[in-house]
Each structure stands twice: as C-alpha cells, then as structure tokens.
C-alpha cells in the first residue's frame, strides 16, 4: 500500500510503535557483527537497539519522509529506499527485523519471498505486526458509520491469525520457531481522531472532507465510554509476533 506518512507527527505523538518494538528485537539471536535489515525502519527509532546488539544494520523503507529523519538520527547507518514487497537483495543478511509493517503490505508472498532471498541460509526473520482483531472496536464503528451514510468502509490492512499466516511463512522457505497472537491495550498521547488521521486515512480517500470529519467526530463520541479511561484514549490492538529461520 502507498502511504504518505507525517513523519514528524509519527515520531513525536506515536512513539509507542518503536517503544513496543524493543521486546521484539530480543528474539533476534544473530551473532555480533552479523548483518541485519530493519525492514520498514520508519524514522529509525529502533536502529540504535539493533546497533547496540552488535549488528551491522541496514534500514529499508519506502517513505522518503521517514528516511529523512532516520538518516539524520543515524548518520553512520546505511539506509535504502525500497518497497518491502519488491526486495532484490540476494543472500546478504543474517537477520531481518520488522516491527509494525507487515499489515500494510498487499503482496504477502512477494514480501516473504524477498525476505527469504535476502537472508543467508539459517538467517532469522523476527517480526511483529497487527493480528486478527486489531483495533476492531474502531474499525467496526467506522464501518457502521460509513454504511449509515451509504458509504463503503474499505479495510486496507491485513490482520491474520497464526493459523492463516504461519503456513504462508513456511511456504516461503522458513521454519517457524516461535509464534504468538496477543492483545495489547495501547494508550495514545492524543485522542482517537488523531489516531484515525495517522493510521486509518485510506478508507476516507474520496470521501467529502466535511462528511469525513463528521464520521470521525461521531466515532470518537460513540467510543468515548469504551476506549477512554480517565481522559486517556487507548486502542484495542492485537499483535502477531513470530520468528522464522530460513531453511530453503
């Protein structure tokens, strides 16, 4: 999916994304000195974590806005602009790390095939992304409000179960050594509308701006008793975290 990110807003107001990625990086057991790709590195917030583990890191992202910040914050690290589903590396990396990226990718087979080709034999893929039911309270309410106005709410993301996704990982040459699907109540710095504006823009494309604003405000008002505690908003995230080792 082609997304134009507000990189500064992402870095300042949605830093929970890289914060949660710290624990994902712990699954990576590549030896020190190994080459690791941070796939969908964004602003490069997790690059220091990987560098501190002793890895030679290459950040890969499709967003110019994100890479501009990543390069500024990590001047000694190699960054490459590339679509995650069109990787053309060959036998280059000992590990691939990815946090909060896979659910944005349309071509999952292309994504996993490219990662497999990029890895050396026995190379590790460590990843976390949205799983089945992620932010469902928000998406269901928006879907209802769209339908109320005769509009179709397009779910432009991919939130699979373990049972749906792990066979795909195995089909693309990996042995799955760890997989878990879990709930993560995720608190926001701002309100629900700010979250929608950052992460759920696609369904509103082509919708009259006044109507879009009306839907967002109504959704926030309707969900206030469900997703707001003591004035602090949260979203009902579900995450799928796994580790795979290249065997083919």
Where are these regions (language model features)?
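A short acidic, Gly/Pro-enriched loop at the edge of an enzyme's catalytic core
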Residues: 85-96
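Short alpha-helix
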Residues: 158-172
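C-terminal helical/coil "lid" or tail adjacent to the Rossmann-like core of SAM-dependent
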Residues: 177-230
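Conserved class I S-adenosyl-L-methionine
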Residues: 1-34, 45-49, 66-69, 73, 124-148
